[in-house]
Amino acid sequence: MSKGSGGITARIIDFTLGLRLADLPPAVLNEARHGLVDTLGVALAGVAEEPASLLRDVQLQAGAAGPCTVLGDARTAAPMTAAQLNAYAAHVLDFDDTQLSTTPDRIFGLLTHPTVPPLAAALAVGERQKATGAQVLEAFLVGFEVECKISEAIHSHHYKKGFHSSGTVGTFGAMAATARLLGLDATQIGHALAIAASMASGIRVNFGTMTKPLHVGRAAQNGVTAAELAARGFTGGGDALDGPWGFFQVFSFADGFDPDRIVGVLGNPHTIVSPGVSIKPYPCGVLGHPSMDAMRTLVLTHDVKPEQIKAIRLRAGSNILNPLRYKVAKSELEAKFSPPFMLSAVAIRRKAGIHEFTDEFVLSEPVQAMMAKVTTVLDPEIEARGFEKIRSTVEVDLLDGRTLVQPADERYRDRKSTRLN
């Protein structure tokens, strides 16, 4: 529980106004450029997905025209609509980066998908404003840092009890990026924060459905809308983040926040550099990635063929097994949160990319048969070690009587230490 905020809302406002690209170290700019390229690539792949097409059809109906590019479509849109559609496309594959936490009390040691909301907002608004590339990059970095530090500060119950922080906190990242490009003053940013706080949304029951990426799309859209409204004189309450009825108190179920994760650390260091982000080798829930790596190691090291496998066991803690909740995946979207599918895909094809995460492959007879061989086990020893890392062990029983065992690597993928191959 926070005992005092020290004017957190005001500090966010000051940071949003004060960051200058010329003052940033080269490492921050380098990581930002990598993030932009990675996320745009993921978004371009995502536009071909059916849910992204459905959303475009609804949002680009007559009367929704505007000057901003919509990826994968010849039509253009207003900034808030373009931001939503492009952010949805960037998250629909579940292939975008993930924020690493600085402290061990955060479940998984992970927080938001930080790049998509501020980037989608900055690109759409920047296009309408005819901003320079440097101005768009500056706005993106403002939004990225605001989003990440708010995510660090709010009590972990925000996520544990059901909110999807990429949707809720991502709204503030998109708002801050937009506010910077619109040139809002301190009073207007305060109103925009309050508007954004009332628009923040996203609940985890929708993981494994078309609605999960809508959380991120709406974060981008709502952030743009909040700043656009404030620019036109629309008002909101004061102390929107740290007031007694503010975002931190309400969205943490009254458990508050840690002001020390914002006070004095906004841009010091920049989260994009330290602790950085985890990049994904597979287009699915990051909680399953270490187990998939372990399965791939077993299959390749021992040259295991699918027909040799009698049974597969995944031993893990509840921080993996509860969120990855689909025991038998019946669609591509469910497969993204299904350990039996994740391990089955690797067992059958020795990889798991966008060509494996399709309804056709998920529903194929070999995959459904392999999933039936997979069981998940809540391991008390792993559970006792805590939740700050994604820990698991994969065991494969072969028909010849051997059992192969591979503990998963606890380290997260990043751009510096792990090649994606």
Model-derived features with residue positions:
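Glycine-rich, mobile lid/loop segments that gate access to catalytic sites or pores
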Residues: 126-225, 237-244
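Short connector loops/turns at beta-strand edges and beta->alpha or beta->beta junctions
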Residues: 117-119, 146, 198-202, 265-269, ...
